[in-house]
Amino acid sequence: MKQKAILIKDFYNDKGALHRGEKVVIEGKAAEGFIRVVTGTGAVYNIPPHIVKKTA
């Protein structure tokens, strides 16, 4: 289930950063309490779901 979303908060980890307003695609669930998202550049991140807002 792929769904488009937009970040509402910044997210940082050792692989890089995602910034507020960035568009991502939700790929599905990752570990418990996290979702897997793909950025426009193709980078994959596991992030908490409360920092994204689903779009149409």
What is each model feature region?
Residues 2-56:
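Basic/aromatic-rich interaction segments and small domains that mediate binding to polyanionic partners
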